[in-house]
Amino acid sequence: MESCNVELIFDHIGHFGRFQIVLYLICAYQSLSCGIHYLSSVFLSIIPEHACKPPGMVRKAVFHNVSAWRLEDILALRSPEHKDHIMVELQDGEIWELTRCSRTWRENTSHLGYEYSGYKHDSPCFDGYVYDQSKWRNSAVRNFNLVCDQKWYARMIQPLIIFGVMLGSITFSYLSDRFGRRMALWCTSIGVFFFGIASLFIFDYLSFMITRFFLVMASSGYFVVVFVYVMEIIGKKARTWASIHLNTFFAIGAMLVALASYLLKTWWLYQIILCIVTTPFILCCWMLPETPFWLLSEGRYKEAQGTVDTMAVWNKSSSCDLVELLSLDVTRSHNKSPHSIRKHRLADLFHNLDVAKMTLIVWLDWFTANLGYYMFGKEVIRRKENEPLYLLLVGAMEIPAYICLCIWLKRVGRRKTMLLFLLVSSLTCMLHVVMPSDYKTAKRMVALLVKSVISSVFAFIYLYTAELYPTTVRCLAVGSSNMVSHVSSIFIPFTSHFSKVWIFLPQILFGILAILSGLLSLKLPETQDTPMKSTWETTEQQVPENKDSLGEGPPDSFERWDSSRALSFAERWGLSRASPDAEKWGSGRVPPDAGKWGAGIAPPVTERGASGRASLEDESGGSGRAPPEKNTEMENEIENMKVSNLGGF
């Protein structure tokens, strides 16, 4: 099936009519929900300031020169850099020294101060812990006491979420290519709804981890599939900005997380509000039809015709007959077995050397973008006292970045955009390195700028990847790239260890990687203003002067015979049929030797055995009819056809 013919559907029914607008808003709303569930884990795994709980009611608490009647008030003033213990006097007169993970009883009850040389007795935190409640009145860490010797359980939350994102990306992208976009969207939407509600009714650490894992797995799978879905349901004229601005809704979701975390200090109430926001989508996800691209790639023409007719009715436009519009493709698809039509394997992304190179470059771009996204995102929000504020700024800065990206993409091609944005991110990263460490606010603003540029790369690379690959593996290509990109998230916690070698080593490595990725992106095909492809066959049959999507033209030894020339020759000389290779080689191609010998000139006749085959007359015993005696022009053209046929076999 010719992808350009599929694109012609939107010329009939509209590129972004009422039907597509409704579907887009439904998909965008759920993208907002994915942003909420993605980033809510940022605050779920925060370890608040804490201290070992004393075995009684506190009468007075002292921390250096500060005293208070409540231990929680002292904890609100203490930062992670403070290592000294807190002195407390209980109602019964006992004095205890409290650290984060231990407590010490003093024998002398008359001295409440740091200078003490009497008898002490250490004991574990049998009574639990006291937490700072200025930010959160309760949280996952507090509910499950994930501190001290249980602290590694809290640190497992983020790696598990990353693994869920990776698994969701590759799993649901495969299911999308195999069973359809709509089926994958239904499964992920139900998963987001079900596990979002289930996360409200958990009372132990294991249940918490299971629900969060499947929740982010479904959210990740949804965002990958919905991006491809939007690109295939919207016409070429509105496809770029519509797909890019799905990330805008994702950023709005991140801003809502920051706002909710600032206003709601109770963890369970915070979760309820976020789940309520994401619930309405489940009521309307059944409206999503399958995309014409996927249906046609699977040979399901009746269903595709029904979808196109429905879209035409909603858009108040004229429909089109797919059998007439895609008649050549319908005939071709009948000659294919179901096995040849349905190939949805990760190995298809490496089915030849050129495709393998393209896939590896795309994966490197994804890896670099994700590395910078989380590295500088961590740099921006690392200040413990203002996490919601900086997360809000991160989301707010991404929105104008996406708008600028859409404007830029209208004027510059995909490859140049990728190169430019990666180079800008590398240069701003170097600016962040050379700035004095005393300018903390300025450095944080530069990190915010780098984060915004990398966010644009991240939004754009979804679009570019979907345009590079055909429908049969499009979602798998985006999903596998997203999975590879999150491999970089595994290295983010180790950047602090790299900083011990040299404080700027992580930023330097990212800057070098960004330059390398940008330069290699020039090797990728240009997809601006080109129709999306439907199969690998259409990917490899692009015109030679523009080169196909794999970066090369068709092989010289297998050039196609122009069927229109063959038919005109048959009509001119009254032959019963055209060249036997006319249908085989397709239209729009020239004979192998046409460029070499020129039009209307016959090449030298190949002698018997020179090519490993006898001439056509030797094998068949002649043409079976005598040529016109006085028509040399006809003889030359017949001889041209014979010699050309030898090259075809």
Swiss-Prot record:
Pfam families according to UniProt: Sugar_tr
Location within or outside the cell: Cell membrane
Gene3D superfamilies in alphabetical order: MFS general substrate transporter like domains
Keyword annotations: Cell membrane, Developmental protein, Differentiation, Glycoprotein, Ion transport, Membrane, Spermatogenesis, Transmembrane, Transmembrane helix, Transport
Region (Disordered) location: 530-560, 579-649
Cellular-component GO terms for this entry: plasma membrane
Keyword Transmembrane helix: yes
Residues annotated as transmembrane: 19-39, 156-176, 190-210, 214-234, 244-264, 268-288, 356-376, 389-409, 417-437, 445-465, 475-495, 501-521
Record bears the keyword Transmembrane helix: yes
Catalytic function, reaction form: (R)-carnitine(in) = (R)-carnitine(out); spermidine(in) = spermidine(out)
Glycosylated sites: 65, 108, 315
GO BP terms, alphabetized: carnitine transmembrane transport; carnitine transport; cell differentiation; monoatomic ion transport; organic cation transport; spermatogenesis; spermidine transmembrane transport
Topology in the lipid bilayer: Multi-pass membrane protein
Primary localization: membrane
SUPFAM superfamilies registered for this protein in UniProt: MFS general substrate transporter (SSF103473)
Positions with biased composition (Polar residues): 530-544
GO terms for MF: amine transmembrane transporter activity; carnitine transmembrane transporter activity; organic cation transmembrane transporter activity; spermidine transmembrane transporter activity
Protein family according to the UniProt entry: Belongs to the major facilitator (TC 2.A.1) superfamily. Organic cation transporter (TC 2.A.1.19) family.
Function: Facilitative organic cation transporter that mediates the transport of carnitine as well as the polyamine spermidine. Mediates the partially Na(+)-dependent bidirectional transport of carnitine. May mediate L-carnitine secretion from testis epididymal epithelium into the lumen which is involved in the maturation of spermatozoa.
Name under which the protein is recorded: Solute carrier family 22 member 16
Source organism of this protein record: Mus musculus
